[in-house]
């Protein structure tokens, strides 16, 4: 959901 979350997923 958050940019940080996306970075963690990618």
Curated annotation (Swiss-Prot):
It comes from the Eukaryota. Has antifungal activity against F.oxysporum, B.cinera and M.arachidicola with IC(50) values of 1.4 uM, 2.5 uM and 0.15 uM, respectively. Has antibacterial activity against the Gram-positive bacteria B.megaterium, B.subtilis and M.phlei, and the Gram-negative bacterium P.vulgaris. No antibacterial activity against the Gram-positive bacteria B.cereus and S.aureus, or the Gram-negative bacteria E.coli, E.aerogenes, P.aeruginosa and P.fluorescens. Has mitogenic activity towards murine splenocytes. Inhibits the proliferation of M1 leukemia and MCF-7 breast cancer cells in vitro. The keyword Lyase does not apply. Belongs to the DEFL family. Keywords: Antibiotic, Antimicrobial, Antiviral protein, Fungicide, Mitogen, Plant defense. The lineage of its organism: Eukaryota, Viridiplantae, Streptophyta, Embryophyta, Tracheophyta. GO terms for biological process: defense response to fungus; defense response to Gram-negative bacterium; defense response to Gram-positive bacterium; killing of cells of another organism; positive regulation of cell cycle; positive regulation of cell division; regulation of defense response to virus; response to virus. This is Defensin-like protein.
């Amino acid at each position: 959901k958050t940019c940080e979350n996306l970075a963690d997923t990618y």
